[in-house]
Design a protein with these regions (language model features):
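Extended active-site neighborhood of metal-dependent phosphoesterases/phosphodiesterases
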Residues: 1-69
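Membrane- and interface-active hydrophobic/amphipathic segments that mediate membrane binding, fusion
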Residues: 227-248
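Acidic/histidine-rich helix-loop elements
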Residues: 3, 8, 43-45, 97, ...
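Solvent-exposed loop/turn segments at secondary-structure junctions
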Residues: 37-42, 80-84, 153-156, 173-177, ...
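His/acidic metal-ligating clusters that form di-metal
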Residues: 31-33, 45-157
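Binuclear metal-dependent phosphoesterase catalytic core
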Residues: 14-26, 32, 121, 126-127, ...
Length: 248
């Protein structure tokens, strides 16, 4: 489109990048990647394809070369999170306060508060555990991703830093015709200083704080994934002893 400022990306129209220039209008301050995480596969999600990963690696190298050999600090946004986000959780027992059940590996988790802060209301529907997209590893190797933010899981809005130093988190839910309204409809704001973009600040703005009323959609919230937690806790309370026997 005539007024689109994004640079055409890989083989799909939804994977691209946008350069953000400094106040002089000439020097690149930072970069934004948008990655299409595609569709479902085998009951889970595929994550990005090899062609998209190849494009990202090439684009990262191109920007680095044009920046005097220094990686261009970048924020990355995509719908489905990478599976490495599970590294911010601690496995726990089902009756632990705040425990969340994961359908991916049938384990219970709580947020590791030494690594992340915010709401953790459902286990991430990340790319499949048995799929190796190589995306997260590429972020680490290229050294340009200063933050990766996701959507999809409406009951999550936490942000944390991985063991590799990459900030990962959720943007919060904005829609009013989807589950998770009881957790608050939000937008995530990013504040960056062109003199030091890596030291950026991000926070959520809540609909109820602006409008003085809570967003609620009882129908969709009834079928929220958080209901799974309640069902599984009842199941474990009744049959947990049998489950533990099978695990042994």
């Amino acid at each position: 489109y005539p007024n689109c400022i994004a640079v055409k990306g890989s083989t799909d129209p939804f994977t691209n990048n946008t350069l953000v220039y400094g106040s002089d209008g000439k020097s690149v301050a930072f970069n934004i990647y948008m990655m299409d995480t595609n569709n479902t596969a085998n009951g889970g999600y595929t994550g990005i394809y090899k062609e998209q990963l190849d494009w990202y690696n090439a684009k990262s190298a191109e920007l680095k070369a044009a920046n005097g050999g220094k990686a261009v600090p970048s924020l990355l946004f995509q719908h489905v999170p990478v599976k490495e986000i599970y590294g911010m959780f601690t496995e726990c027992k089902w009756n632990t306060d705040g425990a969340v059940y994961s359908r991916r590996d049938h384990k219970w988790y709580v947020l590791n508060e030494e690594m992340a802060k915010g709401d953790f209301g459902e286990a991430p529907c990340s790319e499949n555990f048995d799929v190796h997209t190589g995306e997260y590893q590429a972020w680490v190797e290229n050294g340009d991703i200063m933050g990766a933010f996701f959507a999809h899981d409406h009951n999550n809005n936490f942000v944390g830093k991985s063991a590799d130093g990459i900030v990962m988190g959720y943007n919060g839910g904005t829609g009013f015709r989807a589950y998770g309204a009881k957790c608050g409809r939000t937008i995530r704001v990013f504040n960056l200083d062109e003199n030091d973009v890596t030291n950026y600040e991000t926070h959520l703005i809540y609909y109820n704080e602006l409008m003085g009323e809570k967003a609620s959609n009882p129908f969709f919230d009834t079928f929220s994934p958080s209901i799974l937690n309640k069902i599984m806790k009842v199941f474990y309370a009744m049959f947990g002893w049998a489950i533990n026997l099978f695990k042994k």
